[in-house]
Amino acid sequence: MRIGLVEFLLILAIASLTIGPQVALFVDRWLRRANRVNARAARRRAEYAAQAAAERDALLKRFRTASTVFGVCILLALVYTLVFRPIDTPPQAYDAPAVRQDTGAAQTALAADDKGTLDLGEYQNVDCIRARDGLVYAAACDGAALKKCSSDLVRTDGGHTAAVLTVDGELTGFAFDGSGDLWLSILTPGGGSLCRAAHDSWGTAVEQVVTQIDGAPLGAVSAVEAAPDGRIYFAVAAAAGAADGLESTLRTELLAHTGTGCVYVYDPAARSVQKVLGGVAGAAGLALSPDGSTLYVSDLANRCVWRVSADAQDLTAGGKNCSSLVSGLPGYPGALAMDPDGTLYIGYRWARSSWLEKNAGSTLLRGIALRAGRNLQEKLFGLPADAPCTEAVDTADGSWQRVVSGRGAGSVTALCPVESRLYLGLAGSEKVRSANL
């Protein structure tokens, strides 16, 4: 039987009238159910999002609280470290010395070429220079073995360099006495010592002579001088420990101004030690007059050079029988050297710091600088290119003879006049520089 178009349309109409409402009802129920499911899912997502937001806010709040607490702790630790932390050398208030006017002395510059310069090879950080029998001796560290905490006494004739002896620690100074024995000031983390090396045993044995004063370890020994009568003078820069070496001790004393530096004399015949001068704020250098009757002591923080009798006992810097040869120096004096004609050469470790002396009467900022550590302290002091590195004064009348400019050479750590030439040791340099006099 064939169904035509009319019959087909009639069948569709009857079917739609019969089952159409049921289909529509089914679709409606399904759509309603789907909407309810979607609504529940949307509510769950909204709840999850709200819960996540609440948890995130709580976490951020806890993090902010922890960050605030951590920041406050760091701030308190920083304040304690820089302001309240106990230190071995608390700063003392003092009166800053006056600033000297220009002396008008003759100007000399360090030799710019290699003429007169002594190349020490791998040796550097010269702490002391002496001349004897046409040879130049220098206390220096081997640049290839700086971490070994040892120093060498080096001898050179200008072309060949040889190590005479090696000591454990920092060889801060040495001097020859009349018999040819060598006297050494040696600094180790445990303290300082005055030692002797007999002229017939150089390179084999170094004898410790003085390691304590009144039962206390010797402080940071900085210089030694041998008098014509055989007595040996040695300086202690400060009473504080010297774990980081002489330069660190001098910087610390410059900031703290404890005034605990002293000068002692050792009598080899009597084997006795006598205090000559105390109350020095950084006894960094010594020199004796040509006849050995007068002792000169550089006072680092007070920017002056004290003059006392070589026979003096237990004097105080600036007190009775202790006068200043020169004062108000343009820098902080360190090494001293005496010419046979009585001219005293003064080497400057650093140029005068206006910041330091502005805060001379206050201990807060200087205490912060002391606690801040070595890196900051090194940035506080320097020797600019236009600052004098060495000056010469006539000890007879106090007149200024010469000013040596360093051209940015750096801190002067050693001086030695030899005839018409002045040899200089500079911090960190592998060469002994010179200037024509």
Predicted regions and their residues:
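Asp-box/WD-like beta-propeller blade repeats and closely related beta-sheet repeat scaffolds
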Residues: 185-227, 235-251
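Short, conserved, GDST-rich strand-edge loop motifs in beta-rich repeat architectures
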Residues: 143-145, 234-258, 349-384
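Beta-strand-rich domains and repeat architectures in extracellular enzymes and scaffolds
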Residues: 114-147, 409-413
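Surface loop/turn motifs at the tips and blade-to-blade linkers of beta-strand repeat domains
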Residues: 117-123, 163-168, 209-216, 275-281, ...
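Conserved beta-strand positions in repeat-built beta-propeller and related beta-rich domains
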Residues: 121-122, 136-145, 182-190, 232-244, ...
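Blade-loop segments of beta-propeller domains
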Residues: 142, 148-193, 210-213
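A short helix->beta-strand "capping" segment at the edge of beta-propeller domains
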Residues: 93-125, 158, 398-407
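Residue-level detector of Asp-centered blade-edge/turn motifs that repeat once per structural unit
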Residues: 131-134, 176-179, 226-229, 290-292, ...
